[in-house]
Amino acid sequence: LAWRLRDKTSRLAHWFTVTGTNGKTTTVQLLTAMLNQGGIKAEACGNIGKPILDAIRDPEGFDALVVELSSFQLHYLGQIFPFSSAVLNLADDHLDWHGGFEQYKAAKAKVYENTVAACVYNVMDKSTESMVEDADVIDGARAIGFTLGIPGRSQVGYVEDILCDRAFLDDRANNAIEIATLEDLSEIGVLTPHLMAN
């Protein structure tokens, strides 16, 4: 419903959708903070923050909505076209409701459908990569991996004490750029491995 109403608002926001078994709320909060810090008016919504219908109907509007989606919400999701989508990880959860792991995985995989720009997956969780490979995305959307190890091409990861980007630069085959140091991450309280991955 929210997706269908979005074009009737004063400001058409990009949707950044996030799911996974663990880490969704933290990731949505971090992404919302980064977008706002970068001058993009963003709001966390879905399972956290403002209800998504309220965010869409906000009279001032937003440039971006960072939407946390559960497997239950994704199960019933109609067609949307997120700007970017992410599956952080996948573990046995809610299997009684979904009827098994494959059904749970299929519900989570719906987050990638029709993604416009970037499908973010966890390099250390091969099931998330296979979900991206199987997704029907918009032509030009890229698969972007994240890892706590050394990043490969089209990935973000760590080399020694530096968070490196090999995904969003022209010569990603041969180069990387520094995003932050571990000291920077420590200063904002995200130095534990699961928070570093988020």
Predicted regions: what is each one?
Residues 101-102, 140-198:
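Adenine nucleotide phosphate-binding catalytic loops in nucleotide-utilizing enzymes
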Residues 2-142, 157-162, 167:
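Phosphate-binding loop of NTP-binding sites
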